[in-house]
């Protein structure tokens, strides 16, 4: 079955093409740290021949605690993204939380992301669609894979069909997430075979029910990423940090930056193998 291709400049994203890495840091902690992390990603992905898009948030508007670090904000965040693009020649993805942010952010970055908690907010979806930018839609933890078709339809009605879907797990009782591997193919089907990617970092979240920040299971990042990529996906979404224990957001789920290259070698090997098989129709 023909898979839809979404182009991010010269990077083509599709379920049957070599996977694209959407990777970086959870939130912009400082200009210098962003430069350091981006440079490492660029070096490793160029060495391994993996198409790459840098990821970071300029504002974490949905932190659990009012006391948690949110980021540098829109103006300073866009300055950092512009410098990263100019210095390393990378594409950039970041999330928006309000309709008023959509166009200013789309003027700077290459992909704008619809956060999972906001994925059904029609005014935000319409504002993002109007930018004409490539869109990455995070599947909410509380929405079934089949319901993602309705969100995609909103973007299409807004005149934008450059949509990528991203799974980051589903609620499993309170304060825990699991990944339904069967859901990836459902998301492909209901979206007209749009590219589907896997956010392995946030799928590893778990939390203390009375805590102020999410916990995580980064010790299991490799096995979960292997399983997801074995399905045959358009891309992998992952966050890394040189010192996860002291990251300002989601450190417990972040891959240690020093482990990025050996991790990606395994992921690329699995992706290459799975996509060498071709499609096998077992329904008929």
Curated annotation (Swiss-Prot):
Catalytic activities: D-arabinose 5-phosphate + phosphoenolpyruvate + H2O = 3-deoxy-alpha-D-manno-2-octulosonate-8-phosphate + phosphate
InterPro entries with a match to the protein in the record: Aldolase_TIM, DAHP1/KDSA, KDO8P_synthase
GO molecular-function terms, A-Z: 3-deoxy-8-phosphooctulonate synthase activity
Record keywords: Cytoplasm, Lipopolysaccharide biosynthesis, Transferase
Predominant location category: cytoplasm
Pathway(s) where this gene product acts: Carbohydrate biosynthesis; 3-deoxy-D-manno-octulosonate biosynthesis; 3-deoxy-D-manno-octulosonate from D-ribulose 5-phosphate: step 2/3; Bacterial outer membrane biogenesis; lipopolysaccharide biosynthesis
Protein name: 2-dehydro-3-deoxyphosphooctonate aldolase
Localization: Cytoplasm
GO biological process, any: keto-3-deoxy-D-manno-octulosonic acid biosynthetic process
Organism: Citrobacter koseri (strain ATCC BAA-895 / CDC 4225-83 / SGSC4696)
Entry-linked HAMAP family: KDO8P_synth (MF_00056)
Matching PANTHER family: PHOSPHO-2-DEHYDRO-3-DEOXYHEPTONATE ALDOLASE
Pfam families registered for this protein in UniProt: DAHP_synth_1
Xref: NCBIfam families: KDO8P_synth (TIGR01362), PRK05198.1 (NF003543), PRK12457.1 (NF009109)
Annotated EC: 2.5.1.55
Superkingdom field: Bacteria
Gene Ontology CC terms, in alphabetical order: cytoplasm
Family from the record: Belongs to the KdsA family.
């Amino acid at each position: 079955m023909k898979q839809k291709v979404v182009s991010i400049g010269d990077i083509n994203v599709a379920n049957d093409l070599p996977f694209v890495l959407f990777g970086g840091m959870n939130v912009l902690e400082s200009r210098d740290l962003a430069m350091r992390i981006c440079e490492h990603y660029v070096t490793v992905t160029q060495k391994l021949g993996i198409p790459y898009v840098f990821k970071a948030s300029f504002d974490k508007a949905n932190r659990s605690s009012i006391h948690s670090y949110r980021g540098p904000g829109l103006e300073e965040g866009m300055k950092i993204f512009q410098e990263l693009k100019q210095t390393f020649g990378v594409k950039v993805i970041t999330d928006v939380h309000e309709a008023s942010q959509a166009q200013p952010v789309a003027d700077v970055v290459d992909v704008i992301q619809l956060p999972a908690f906001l994925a059904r907010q029609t005014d935000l979806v319409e504002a993002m669609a109007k930018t004409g930018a490539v869109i990455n839609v995070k599947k909410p933890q509380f929405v079934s894979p089949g319901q993602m078709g309705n969100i995609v339809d909103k973007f299409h009605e807004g005149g934008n069909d450059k949509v990528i879907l991203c799974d980051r797990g589903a609620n499993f009782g309170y304060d825990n997430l699991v990944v339904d591997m069967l859901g990836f193919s459902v998301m492909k089907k209901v979206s007209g075979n749009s590219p589907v990617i896997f956010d392995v970092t946030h799928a590893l979240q778990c939390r203390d029910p009375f805590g102020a920040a999410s916990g995580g299971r980064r010790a299991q990042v490799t096995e979960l990423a292997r399983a997801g990529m074995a399905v045959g996906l358009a891309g992998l979404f992952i966050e890394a940090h040189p010192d996860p224990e002291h990251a300002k957001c989601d450190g417990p789920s972040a891959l240690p930056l020093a482990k990025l290259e050996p991790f990606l070698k395994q992921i690329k090997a699995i992706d290459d193998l799975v996509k060498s098989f071709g499609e096998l129709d077992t329904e008929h």
